[in-house]
Regions:
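Primarily mature extracellular domains of secreted and cell-surface proteins
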Residues: 1-152
Length: 152
């Protein structure tokens, strides 16, 4: 079956100290009948640069995709929840202007394009895809678990 789960609320990530905080608002998980799923939300935050990190600009709220999944039903039970890997590994992305190119290899991957595009404005886009950095093995999303109970 198909399903939609919506959460109300906001969480903030101070990814690079206080220089480029961002926040995720009202995430929504949509699962189709075949088990493919997408986690979307609104993102907002502040942008900065390495050249002048003390100057921050407030970025407009933007709808984005946080994660995509191939088959969530393979990792659990429809009636109670699941844990599934994201589509990070092997995903292609077009880096925002001024960002390093995406590289291949065993750790090639990317967070969803809209998420990377938003972070082109924060100055941290290359943190969210394989860019050839030593940290590339650490950029992949961890498996996501969603657990619930169904009330008829």
């Amino acid at each position: 079956g198909a399903a939609t789960i919506r959460w109300s609320g906001t969480f903030t990530v101070n990814f690079y100290g206080s220089y480029t905080p961002f926040w995720i608002v009202d995430p929504t998980l949509t699962v189709d009948a075949g088990g493919a799923a997408r986690l979307t939300a609104t993102i907002g935050g502040r942008g900065s640069s390495q050249e002048n990190p003390d100057i921050q600009i407030t970025l407009p709220d933007t709808p984005i995709t946080l994660a995509e999944f191939a088959d969530v039903y393979a990792g659990g039970a429809i009636a109670s929840g699941w844990t599934a890997p994201t589509r990070y590994l092997g995903s292609n992305v077009t880096p925002p202007a001024g960002s390093p190119a995406q590289v291949g290899g065993v750790h090639k991957g990317a967070w969803p394009q809209s998420f990377v595009d938003f972070h082109g404005q924060t100055g941290t886009a290359a943190y969210w895809y394989s860019s050839g950095a030593a940290a590339d093995p650490l950029k992949a999303q961890e498996p996501v678990g969603v657990h619930y109970s169904l009330n008829p």
